[in-house]
């Protein structure tokens, strides 16, 4: 389940409260239990996956969660699989660890692992959201955010796209608030 860290150090783990905190940004967060991870647990524990295994995971996931694509107008999806041996891991981390926006929404369903997303709220305050297995996150276009892997460096998620070119980051130059940089 997701948790939210506020600037004052408060940690919120109640999903309804997290959703309320993120509502001014238009962010949608939902936890689906059980998730599709029960359909392919052996593949979720592997670091490296073949293209065939990735397609198998996405196909099984879509057989259960096809409504996510239909309800939100997503055109396509893929599997993001990051692990300590991923090629260009440090480049990937550096690319998304800076505050940025996208012209298209960013949406994903977490299959395994965890990731941290930082957001700038309308009042300028910042929050950090930890998403975990079975969490679905939709970030509207234009929302200022960053994301980072946790120390495990393991993360698998189905990513959803509304544009052919995916999520192209537009960097904003906003700095991470020191109270959240722990």
UniProtKB/Swiss-Prot annotation:
Keywords: Amino-acid biosynthesis, Dioxygenase, Iron, Metal-binding, Methionine biosynthesis, Nickel, Oxidoreductase. It is an enzyme of class 1 (oxidoreductase). Ni(2+) binds at residues 100, 102, 106, 145. SUPFAM superfamilies: RmlC-like cupins. Pathway: Amino-acid biosynthesis; L-methionine biosynthesis via salvage pathway; L-methionine from S-methyl-5-thio-alpha-D-ribose 1-phosphate: step 5/6. It comes from the Bacteria. The keyword Metal-binding applies. GO terms for molecular function: acireductone dioxygenase (Ni2+-requiring) activity; acireductone dioxygenase [iron(II)-requiring] activity; iron ion binding; nickel cation binding. One of its GO terms (biological process) is L-methionine salvage from methylthioadenosine. Binds 1 Fe(2+) cation per monomer. It holds the Pfam family ARD. Its cofactor is Fe(2+); Ni(2+). Gene3D superfamilies: Jelly Rolls. Fe(2+) binds at residues 100, 102, 106, 145. It catalyses: 1,2-dihydroxy-5-(methylsulfanyl)pent-1-en-3-one + O2 = 3-(methylsulfanyl)propanoate + CO + formate + 2 H(+); 1,2-dihydroxy-5-(methylsulfanyl)pent-1-en-3-one + O2 = 4-methylsulfanyl-2-oxobutanoate + formate + 2 H(+). PANTHER family: ACIREDUCTONE DIOXYGENASE. HAMAP family: Salvage_MtnD. Belongs to the acireductone dioxygenase (ARD) family. Catalyzes 2 different reactions between oxygen and the acireductone 1,2-dihydroxy-3-keto-5-methylthiopentene (DHK-MTPene) depending upon the metal bound in the active site. Fe-containing acireductone dioxygenase (Fe-ARD) produces formate and 2-keto-4-methylthiobutyrate (KMTB), the alpha-ketoacid precursor of methionine in the methionine recycle pathway. Ni-containing acireductone dioxygenase (Ni-ARD) produces methylthiopropionate, carbon monoxide and formate, and does not lie on the methionine recycle pathway. This is Acireductone dioxygenase.
């Amino acid at each position: 389940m997701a948790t939210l860290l506020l600037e004052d150090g408060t940690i919120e783990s109640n999903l309804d409260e997290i959703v309320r905190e993120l509502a001014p940004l238009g962010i949608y967060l939902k936890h689906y239990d059980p998730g599709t991870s029960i359909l392919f647990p052996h593949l979720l524990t592997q670091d490296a996956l073949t293209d065939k295994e990735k397609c198998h995971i996405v196909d099984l996931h879509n057989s259960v969660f096809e409504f996510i694509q239909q309800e939100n107008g997503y055109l396509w999806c893929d599997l993001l699989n990051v692990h300590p041996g991923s090629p260009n891991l440090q480049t990937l981390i550096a690319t998304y660890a800076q505050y940025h926006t996208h012209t298209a929404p960013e949406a994903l369903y977490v299959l395994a692992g965890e990731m941290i997303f930082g957001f700038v709220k309308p009042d300028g305050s910042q929050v950090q959201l930890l998403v975990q297995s079975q969490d679905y996150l939709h970030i509207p276009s234009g929302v200022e955010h960053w994301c980072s892997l946790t120390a495990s460096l393991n993360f698998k998620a189905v990513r959803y796209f509304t544009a052919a070119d995916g999520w192209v980051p537009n960097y904003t130059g906003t700095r991470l608030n020191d109270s959240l940089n722990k």
